[in-house]
Amino acid sequence: MNEYITQIEKCVALHPYAMILREKDMDRQDYRELARHIQVMCRKASVKMFVHSDISAAKYADCGNVHFSMEHFKQMCEEQADVIKRLDCVSVSCHSMEEAVNAVRAGADQIVLGTIFETQCKPGKMGAGLSFLKEVCRAAHTVNPTVKVFAIGGIKPDNIKKVLEASADGGCMMSWFMQHN
């Protein structure tokens, strides 16, 4: 765990726009503690942190930013819309035009759209490409001009310029950040 924390410290020191803390296999209490620790680290560096899906962990970490899968976001909108509305920033993973537009209409402040390029995380799965990214950005901004759209999947320093040229607000680079520094 210490190597992991050290790598996150290195990532935060690079001052990315944000960090999404996703640890789906971690014990819930351990995740809450980790979220609190990382939130302190991120605040000091003025990096926005998102807790992944766990509202109670977000509260525990004093973090108002939560990232959801599309399925979980839909469920939260149906069952706990008041909780969603009280969050500072709601981020949603989307994999199609329909999901992106629906997420923005339902109140997402940002979407993470993928998979744009082929990635090591999902070998053999073709990326949707830059045209898809551009079309979704256009549609999302038609619904809400202030929504942020971030690309995910195979994003690296050598292709981020193309992502930005496709009208995205940025790109998520988990593998690159965790393997470099």
Predicted features by range, described:
Residues 1-65, 75-87, 181:
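N-terminal positively charged helical leader segments and presequences
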Residues 10, 24-29, 70-73, 126-137:
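Short, composition-biased local secondary-structure segments
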Residues 20-22, 50-52, 69, 91-93, ...:
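A cross-family glycoside hydrolase active-site/sugar-binding cleft signature
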Residues 32-53, 78-96, 126-151, 157:
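Alpha-helix-loop-beta-strand connector modules within alpha/beta enzyme cores
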Residues 49-64, 95-107, 138-145, 149-151, ...:
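Catalytic cores of alpha/beta
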Residues 66-79, 112-126, 154-181:
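Glycine-rich phosphate-binding active-site loops on the catalytic face of alpha/beta enzymes
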Residues 90-122:
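Histidine/lysine/aspartate-rich catalytic loop segments that bind and position anionic ligands
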